[in-house]
Amino acid sequence: MLILGIESSCDETGVGIIELSDNGHMEIRADVVASSMEQHARFGGVVPEIASRAHLEAMPQVMKAALEEAGVEKPDAVAATVGPGLAGALLVGASAAKAFASAWGVPFYGVNHLGGHVAVANLEGEELPHSVALLVSGGHTQLLEVEAVGKPMKELGTTLDDAAGEAYDKVSRLLGLGYPGGPVIDKLAAQGKPTIDLPRGLSKAEDLRGPNRHNFSFSGLKTAVARHVEKAEREGTTVQVEDLCASFQEAVADVLTAKAVRACQDTGAKVLLLGGGVAANSRLRALAAKRCESAGIELRVPRFKLCTDNGVMIAAVAAQLIHEGAEPSGLACGTDTQLEVEVPLVAAR
């Protein structure tokens, strides 16, 4: 059975095709992604209207390329991200998916974007057991308890202000490094040393005992970087950009990995899964590996291409649901910018 997945929650237009065997095994047949990142760069972040228009323009070509890559004329089912995400962007992808499903006469499944980031774990090795997922991107920073792929997830913690990826972009803009901030800061950090003392949000003893035990905050860190730059300007000194990037990156990775490992210990999960665009960050991966090894926790990190938004992850979560006998969502299925993590599949109306 062939399942085609469409992802359009932010600035990537992704179409992926997965072949689902009767025993539940999944094989990637196509993975095509078009990004509108360059169009957003001049604005220093994603502009929703530009993202929506870019999806409209890219969808026909991306769809054609995916079908050609898989060597098929049509799939047996179509799935799309219906939330969470940007309203216009979600609407483009979901509408396209439903139109293709209707034209091909195949069922439509409306799935959760965050569930997709978790589902790619089943494509990388053994089936994901009870675990904690740390999903980190420009729009999300969440700790989720996962019983299994395709099942309702439980939010353990989230950011109370900026997402980690958003903090990277803002700091990059502050330092004049451009957009997106993640790759350039990661590169410069490798050339510097984390010698600048920067705050770790919600990491004090009282925070770790209270309701913010698993929550994050990056606004204070961002402000501290800004003050460091302002102080250098006042004093006429040179900002050591490489050291500042290394210090900022260390602070982010420190908090993310410490809280992720603690969440595993609190829930009894023996696996930590990293997902989202920031999961491609070299320091986050290295520190997560070190701390997981010390704590006796298995770390799973998707290959770089599957960390960022893509259609394969949407096809993967739909494939798991189909294998378990889930009913299609139907063409009346709507989108929800704030879709809860407890909803892996939007039910038929």
Swiss-Prot record:
One of its GO terms (cellular component) is cytoplasm. GO terms for molecular function: iron ion binding; N(6)-L-threonylcarbamoyladenine synthase activity. InterPro entries: ATPase_NBD, Gcp-like_dom, KAE1/TsaD, Peptidase_M22_CS, TsaD. Pfam families: TsaD (PF00814). The keyword Cytoplasm applies. It comes from the Bacteria. Its cofactor is Fe(2+). Required for the formation of a threonylcarbamoyl group on adenosine at position 37 (t(6)A37) in tRNAs that read codons beginning with adenine. Is involved in the transfer of the threonylcarbamoyl moiety of threonylcarbamoyl-AMP (TC-AMP) to the N6 group of A37, together with TsaE and TsaB. TsaD likely plays a direct catalytic role in this reaction. Belongs to the KAE1 / TsaD family. This is tRNA N6-adenosine threonylcarbamoyltransferase. It comes from Corynebacterium aurimucosum (strain ATCC 700975 / DSM 44827 / CIP 107346 / CN-1).
